[in-house]
Amino acid sequence: MQNITDSWFVQGMIKATSDAWLKGWDERNGGNLTLRLDETDIAPFAANFHEKPRYIALSQPMPLLTNTPFIVTGSGKFFRNVQLDPAANLGVVKIDSDGAGYHILWGLTHDAVPTSELPAHFLSHCERIKATHGKDRVIMHCHATNLIALTYVLENNTALITRKLWEGSTECLVVFPDGVGILPWMVPGTDEIGQATAQEMQKHSLVLWPFHGVFGSGPTLDETFGLIDTAEKSAEVLVKIYSMGGMKQTITREELVALGKRFGVTPLASAVALY
């Protein structure tokens, strides 16, 4: 019998959560991660499912996600412990046919529940499905240190944050040409912050929560982790630049335009036009 803990998606979640903790992005129970699956992914492991899956109602219906399975991190769970006990810290859930709730098919043992940011994740999945024609499958939230730091010292608007991150590392414009959305500070774990995040996810694969963290979206766990890692590396460079007295020279507007042309991407217009 195949064991679900050996599946590509459980092993992928173990690696992503372990790597994020080692980066220092997910202290204690900080951060959450969800991966949209297909029925064919989970079908071979039906023998591992709970005999009586628990049902949990959603705070709002998700008709776009009906009958869709996900693997998710648990509420109050530590990323550093996922590798030690995947079944206690992860769960496979499946949205019901009416989109009003979901069953926990596997994992989340001892009456654990999915991340408190599940509304933000599911709403963002809906928007990224539409924006990428189903290509994006991952939503990752973490407390990336230097990205958080920048929200204290830079004006919190999309064009400026995006432009500065592009200037912090040449690859950034290529990796996230659609820029970085940013919210006002909001109480986490609510439908309101979920809706605001999803609205930004219509236009951006990265969304900053000031003084808190970042949301990233991508087609795979590796791509999503790499997206956040790239932005965080640039933020680290910027933090060092500002601590040394600021920029004396940087990548120019003309050079950013040339970079976009070379790699066949269309940079966020408002960030290019900023100065």
From Swiss-Prot:
It catalyses: L-rhamnulose 1-phosphate = (S)-lactaldehyde + dihydroxyacetone phosphate. Its EC number is 4.1.2.19. It is found in: Cytoplasm. Pathway: Carbohydrate degradation; L-rhamnose degradation; glycerone phosphate from L-rhamnose: step 3/3. Binds 1 zinc ion per subunit. It is an enzyme of class 4 (lyase). The keyword Cytoplasm applies. Its main location: cytoplasm. The active site is at E117. Pfam families: Aldolase_II. GO terms for molecular function: metal ion binding; rhamnulose-1-phosphate aldolase activity. One of its GO terms (cellular component) is cytosol. Zn(2+) binds at H141, H143, H212. SMART domains: Aldolase_II. Its cofactor is Zn(2+). One of its GO terms (biological process) is pentose catabolic process. Keywords: Cytoplasm, Lyase, Metal-binding, Rhamnose metabolism, Zinc. The keyword Cytoplasm applies. Catalyzes the reversible cleavage of L-rhamnulose-1-phosphate to dihydroxyacetone phosphate (DHAP) and L-lactaldehyde. NCBIfam families: PRK03634.1, rhamnu_1P_ald. Belongs to the aldolase class II family. RhaD subfamily. Homotetramer. This is Rhamnulose-1-phosphate aldolase. The gene is rhaD.
